[in-house]
Amino acid sequence: MLDPKFLRSDIETAAERLALRGYKLDVATINALEEQRKVLQTRTQELQAERNARSKAIGEAKRLGQDVAPLMAQVGSLGSELEQCKKQQDEILEQLRQIALLVPNLPADTVPVGKDESENVEVRRWGTPRQFDFEIKDHVAVGEDNGGLDFATATKISGSRFVVLKGQIARMHRALAQFMLDLHTQQHGYTECYVPYLVNADSLLGTGQLPKFAEDLFHTAINGEGDEEGKVRKFSLIPTAEVPLTNIARDEIYDEKALPVKMTAHSPCFRSEAGSYGRDTRGLIRMHQFDKVEMVQLVHPEKSWDALEEMVGHAEKVLQLLGLPYRVVSLCTGDMGFSAAKTYDLEVWLPAQNTYREISSCSNCTDFQARRMQARVRGADSKPQLLHTLNGSGLAVGRTLVAVLENYQQADGRIEVPEVLRPYMSGLTHIG
C-alpha cells in the first residue's frame, strides 16, 4: 500500500507515476474525500477546544457556587457532536484506505516505460542454445515417451491443467527442488522454512493478492473448533510461498542488526489462472498446481536495491549450474506485478518453442507490502520504520523440469540427467 499521506499531499505526482503502469488513479474522489476529512478535522479541533473551555468554566462556576446545569448541557451537546465528527472522520479514512488497497506500487525510476511485455528490456544473456542434429520434441512428447508425464490420468482425477508425474521424471522433479534448496541454504545464506499452504485473508492482504485478485485464488472454509467453535474459518490456498514467508514479518519490529532476513521454501502453488483461457493449454507451463522454490528477503530500506541484484544472481546460479541458457529481462512499467516497484524476469531457453519463457520473477516491493503488514525495523537510536520486502522464484520447479526435458533430450529418446542433479538421483546419468 502506498503511503496515505503521500497520496493526500502529492496526489498529482502519484497519478503521473501510476499512469506509467497503466493505472488511472481516481484523483477527483480522493481529493473530495480529503477535503471532507480536512473540514471534519478542523471542526473536531474546534469542538475539542470549545468543550475544554466549557469544562474550565464549569469548574470556575462550581467554585463560585453558580448553577452549572446550563454549562453541563452545553458540554454534553458538544460531546455528542464531537463523537459524530470523529465517526465521520473514521468512515472517510476507511474509504481512503479501501481505495489505497487497490492502488499498485509506484514504479522505480529505473524501470523502463512501456505498455506490455513487448516493451520489456533485455539486460543480458547467458549460455548458447544447443544445436540439435535430430528433430526436437517438446517436453510433453519427451516426458510421455519416457512414461513420466500422464496428463490423461490427471484430467480424469481433477480436470485440465493438472499432471501426474511418474518414475524417474517424478524423481527428477523432486531432485530439482532439493538441489535448489541446498544451493540457496548452503551457498546463498537463506534459511529453509516449511510454511502453511492454507492462509487467511490478512496474509493475502499483506502481500497484495487481496482485495484485488481474489478470483486468481482457490478458496476453502471449515467449521471452527475450540475458541472458534460455531464460526466458519476461511482460507485460501497459497498462489506462492511468498505469501506465508513474507507474512512472517507481519506486525513485527526487527532490530536493524538482524537484517537481512533471508528465507526460502519449497511449496506447491495453486492458481485459478483466471484470464488465461486458451493460453499454454499443452504441457506443464501453466498449471493450476505447480511447485516452486521461493526466496524472500526482509531488508533495511537503504539496501533493497542491492538486495534485488543479489537475488537475481541467486536465481541465475540455479540455471547456470543446470547448464540451461537464459536471459534476464527488466519488466516495463505496464508488465509489472501489483506489489512490485521493479521486477526482473529470468527466461529460460525452450528449444521446442524456439524462444525464451519465464522461469523466475524477482521483485523489490520496497515498503509497499511492509506498510500493509506493519513490518518494521528499528535502529539503535531511531524510531521504527517500514522495512523493505523482496521476493523471487528460485526457481519454478515444473518449468525447470520442462527446460531440462527439452534441452537434455537425446537422439535415442532418452533424457540426460544434468550433472548437478546426479547426486540426488543415485548417480543416474540418463532416464529412459
UniProtKB/Swiss-Prot annotation:
It catalyses: tRNA(Ser) + L-serine + ATP = L-seryl-tRNA(Ser) + AMP + diphosphate + H(+); tRNA(Sec) + L-serine + ATP = L-seryl-tRNA(Sec) + AMP + diphosphate + H(+). It is found in: Cytoplasm. GO terms for molecular function: ATP binding; serine-tRNA ligase activity. It comes from the Bacteria. Pathway: Aminoacyl-tRNA biosynthesis; selenocysteinyl-tRNA(Sec) biosynthesis; L-seryl-tRNA(Sec) from L-serine and tRNA(Sec): step 1/1. GO terms for cellular component: cytoplasm. L-serine binds at residues 240-242, 294, 393. One of its GO terms (biological process) is seryl-tRNA aminoacylation. ATP binds at residues 271-273, 358-361. Its EC number is 6.1.1.11. It is an enzyme of class 6 (ligase). Keywords: Aminoacyl-tRNA synthetase, ATP-binding, Cytoplasm, Ligase, Nucleotide-binding, Protein biosynthesis. Belongs to the class-II aminoacyl-tRNA synthetase family. Type-1 seryl-tRNA synthetase subfamily. Homodimer. The tRNA molecule binds across the dimer. Consists of two distinct domains, a catalytic core and a N-terminal extension that is involved in tRNA binding. Catalyzes the attachment of serine to tRNA(Ser). Is also able to aminoacylate tRNA(Sec) with serine, to form the misacylated tRNA L-seryl-tRNA(Sec), which will be further converted into selenocysteinyl-tRNA(Sec). This is Serine--tRNA ligase. It comes from Tolumonas auensis (strain DSM 9187 / NBRC 110442 / TA 4). The gene is serS.
